Design a protein with these regions (language model features):
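Short catalytic/metal-binding and nucleic-acid-binding patches
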Residues: 1-368
Length: 368
């Protein structure tokens, strides 16, 4: 079976949510303690985190979630073609030169703003602004800048040459709200599943830990780079749509009625999401036989199947290839790509994740 091309997975003209991931070459622990060499490279996780944070400020891409581990990372990104279209030509060029400064600035180690002459030089190149506008809302270019930076810096520290990353990064499109929820939980629980920490608050380089620290004592300012978790509007169990597959026209209608360009991520508050993660973590550890009886109330409000969500959140990477969603969402995505079907859940998995009150509910379960 041929591999889906990246251009099939990513739709540049539509706001979409994507799960992106990459692994270090030969699965070596080059961003943590490496048992083979006995060297601790944990400080490199902070390098990757700071670079991601810096890039997020200049790209027209929302970072919904992240997890940086010893030998791989996960990102949940939302492209924002609506934002980049609002930017002037000068703003586009200035943002790109902050991401990729001129050779002279790099050689001198400068971090100043680009000069008017540098901006004019870029603008005068044929089709250059149009190309840069496309890049600023393309997750592939953000991952490229992130991976290249880490590869060069880590190889320089080790005084070696060669590949740092195993291959090109993987990308999976999240087609509906339940897929976004399941994937975000999968990413945020990665350190817990890897037995690196026991609680969701205990790991420094994961999005849920950063959100909770900011919520508790304002110790970390996420407002400038990490997308808000809670959707705008009321979160009272009523139907709310995550903006993850709208056209520019549809998105413009929403933003015209709002003073903010932040879209949010999930139809729930941070407290509800944290409670859900703790419950999912207890399911993974098998803490007690009555855990299923203490299902978080948010699942009842959103009418989600707890068994299906738990299974999807713990095995998300194995269940879906280049797209994730309920069978109806996968069928629509297959039609968009001109394919007969997209690999998703097998019949056995669908039966396992089917809700007791509906024969159409599958994992990730779709809000009804």
């Amino acid at each position: 079976m041929t591999r889906a091309r990246r251009c099939e997975v990513f739709d540049a003209d539509t706001v979409g949510v994507y799960h992106c991931f990459n692994r270090i070459v030969r699965r070596s622990y080059l961003c943590g303690f490496d048992p083979r060499t006995g060297i601790d490279y944990s400080h490199r996780r902070e390098w990757l985190y700071q670079r991601l944070k810096s890039l997020a400020k200049h790209f027209a891409i929302d970072v919904l979630g992240y997890a940086i581990l010893s030998n791989h990372y996960h990102l949940i990104l939302r492209n924002r073609p609506d934002l980049v279209q609002r930017m002037s030509d000068e703003q586009v060029v200035r943002a790109w030169l902050k991401i990729c400064p001129s050779r002279g600035q790099r050689c001198r180690g400068l971090s100043r703003d680009p000069s008017d002459a540098e901006i004019h030089a870029e603008q005068s190149r044929a089709n250059r602004v149009q190309e840069l506008r496309m890049r600023l809302s393309n997750p592939s270019w953000l991952i490229r800048q992130l991976s290249q930076y880490m590869g060069i810096r880590c190889n320089a520290e080790d005084q070696i040459r060669g590949h740092f990353w195993e291959s090109r990064f993987g990308m999976r499109r999240l087609l509906d709200e339940a897929a976004v929820l399941a994937c975000l939980a999968y990413v945020d629980l990665n350190p817990v599943r890897a037995s690196m920490v026991e609680s969701i608050e205990g790991y420094p380089h994961v999005s849920i830990g950063e959100r909770l620290r900011a919520f508790d004592d304002d110790a970390v300012d996420t407002s400038s780079w990490l997308a808000p978790l809670e959707l705008a509007g009321q979160c009272d169990g009523t139907s709310v749509t995550v903006v993850n597959r709208l056209s520019r026209k549809q998105l413009a209608e929403i933003l015209d009625n709002s003073s903010s360009t932040e879209l949010g991520s999930l139809p729930m508050k941070l407290e509800d999401y944290a409670e859900l993660l703790r419950w999912l973590a207890s399911q993974h550890r098998g803490d007690g036989t009555t855990a299923l009886c203490r299902v978080p109330s948010i699942l009842t409000k959103l009418k989600l199947d707890p068994v299906g969500l738990s299974s999807s959140a713990n095995q998300f990477g194995r269940r879906f290839s280049t797209a994730a969603g309920c069978p109806a969402s996968l069928a629509i995505e297959a039609e968009r790509r001109g394919r007969l079907r997209i690999h998703g859940l097998g019949k056995r998995s669908q039966d396992h994740c089917r809700g007791s009150d509906s024969t159409e509910s599958t994992a990730p379960p779709t809000p009804r």
